[in-house]
Swiss-Prot record:
Catalytic activity entry: 1-(2-carboxyphenylamino)-1-deoxy-D-ribulose 5-phosphate + H(+) = (1S,2R)-1-C-(indol-3-yl)glycerol 3-phosphate + CO2 + H2O
Pfam families listed in its UniProt record: IGPS
Family (UniProt): Belongs to the TrpC family.
SUPFAM superfamilies: Ribulose-phoshate binding barrel
UniProt cross-references to HAMAP family, sorted A to Z: IGPS_B
Organism: Rhizobium johnstonii (strain DSM 114642 / LMG 32736 / 3841) (Rhizobium leguminosarum bv. viciae)
Pathway: Amino-acid biosynthesis; L-tryptophan biosynthesis; L-tryptophan from chorismate: step 4/5
A biological process from GO: L-tryptophan biosynthetic process
Keywords associated with the record: Amino-acid biosynthesis, Aromatic amino acid biosynthesis, Decarboxylase, Lyase, Tryptophan biosynthesis
Name this protein carries in UniProt: Indole-3-glycerol phosphate synthase
Top-rank taxon: Bacteria
A GO MF term: phosphoribosylanthranilate isomerase activity
Gene assigned in the entry: trpC
Length: 270
């Protein structure tokens, strides 16, 4: 685990302890009962693939540790609506506050503003957080293999499955990929960002994609800015992408989403 992830785990475990003291598991389960059923995150991405289209997980992210504030005029419901209008298949919403200025209410508000399934984008360590995610309306959780043991990852995955949610398993290298493939989740995300150096390269996805059989759905994460980037990864059978910063910085988010998915030329021809 990197020093960055170790620091994150320290504050996350403090957050979890504080949350448990305020909101019990029974409270979370009561909140879950008031949520609409999971919308089918994996199913939505498969539908795009089967239709011969790129599947986009569009991210709602106010800030990041490496880039600082990304979008000053930050309104999750408006962004969710714009992403849906632009053709996104799913949402990813940051709920981590210290590093990304995220919040649970951003997830709930964004999901309520559209019909898209939503991922709780956060650092998951305990099953309590899985119950939080469902209570807030999430349809999917993220597991970062670099920060979890095999047993921890499986426990979190199984808890999510029990709640009807999907699980996106994130890897960055071959060793993490081998571990991820031991899990049953069909959603595998390849993060092109090195969490040690923050360098980003699409060659990470290109190197790891051949390790994965066709029964899994690969998601390219980080470093995807243009339709050409999507086409490049399509060459290694990656047709689904998680994109945040490059879209969040655009004034017209819906138009930027369409351009990413279909290309500037296709948009101009409309």
């Amino acid at each position: 685990m990197t020093d960055i992830l170790k620091k994150i785990e320290l504050y996350k475990r403090e957050e979890i302890a504080a949350a448990k003291a305020t909101v019990s598991l029974a409270d979370l389960k009561a909140m879950q009962a008031g949520q609409s059923a999971p919308r089918g995150f994996h199913k939505a991405l498969i539908a795009k693939r089967d239709a011969g289209r790129f599947g986009l997980i569009a991210e709602i992210k106010k800030a990041s540790p490496s880039k600082g504030l990304i979008r000053p005029d930050f309104d999750p419901p408006s962004l969710a609506s714009a992403y849906e209008a632009g053709g996104a298949a799913c949402l990813s919403v940051l709920t981590d506050t210290p590093s990304f200025q995220g919040a649970p209410e951003f997830l709930t508000a964004a999901r309520s503003a559209c019909t898209l399934p939503a991922l709780r984008k956060d650092f998951m360590f305990e099953t309590y957080q899985v119950h939080e995610a469902r209570a807030w309306g999430a349809d999917c959780i993220l597991l970062i293999m670099a920060s979890l043991s095999d047993d921890e990852a499986e426990r979190l995955q199984d808890e999510a499955f029990a709640l009807g949610m999907d699980v996106l398993v994130e890897v960055h290298d071959a060793e993490e990929m081998e571990r991820a493939l031991k899990l049953s989740s069909p959603l595998i995300g390849i993060n092109n960002r090195n969490l040690r150096t923050f360098e980003v390269s699409l060659t990470v996805s290109e190197a790891l994609a051949p390790m994965v059989s066709a029964d899994r759905l690969l998601v390219g994460e980080s470093g995807i800015f243009t339709h050409a980037d999507c086409k490049r990864l399509q060459a290694v059978d990656i047709n689904t992408f998680l994109v945040g910063e490059s879209l969040m910085r655009k004034e017209d988010v819906a138009a930027a989403t369409r351009a990413l998915l279909f290309g500037e030329a296709a948009i101009a021809a409309e």
